[in-house]
Regions:
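Amphipathic alpha-helical "stem/stalk" segments
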Residues: 1-106
């Protein structure tokens, strides 16, 4: 559902689609799950390499699809740390991609 909302955002340029009742729960669940995994990775409870071996691509795709709404929420809440663990995890996924698959693009 996150990707469907993102596709509609790209078509219309209207970022309120992420807060539409039809998508909001799924968007929130997805970004919260990645933020929680990011916290587990950051604290060494989940291996970074093990996680990224399996999930690097979906992590990057999800970050790219949700970055606009995360940034909007950071601004509206005046809280730059909102979903920071997800952002760091996505940054790690990008580094992983560049190292393991230099010619790949998400």
């Amino acid at each position: 559902m996150l990707f469907e909302a993102y596709r509609k955002y790209k078509e219309t340029g209207n970022d309120s689609i992420f807060d539409d009742e039809f998508y909001k729960e799924y968007v929130n669940r997805t970004i919260s799950d990645f933020n929680e995994v990011g916290a587990l990775v950051k604290n060494g409870l989940v291996s970074t390499n093990l996680f990224l071996d399996v999930y690097w691509n979906i992590t990057l795709r999800s970050w790219n699809a949700s970055r606009i709404i995360i940034q909007k929420r950071r601004t509206s809440r005046n809280y730059n740390e909102y979903m920071i663990n997800f952002e760091v995890l996505a940054s790690d996924a990008e580094k992983y991609e560049n190292k393991r698959f230099p010619s790949s693009s998400v």
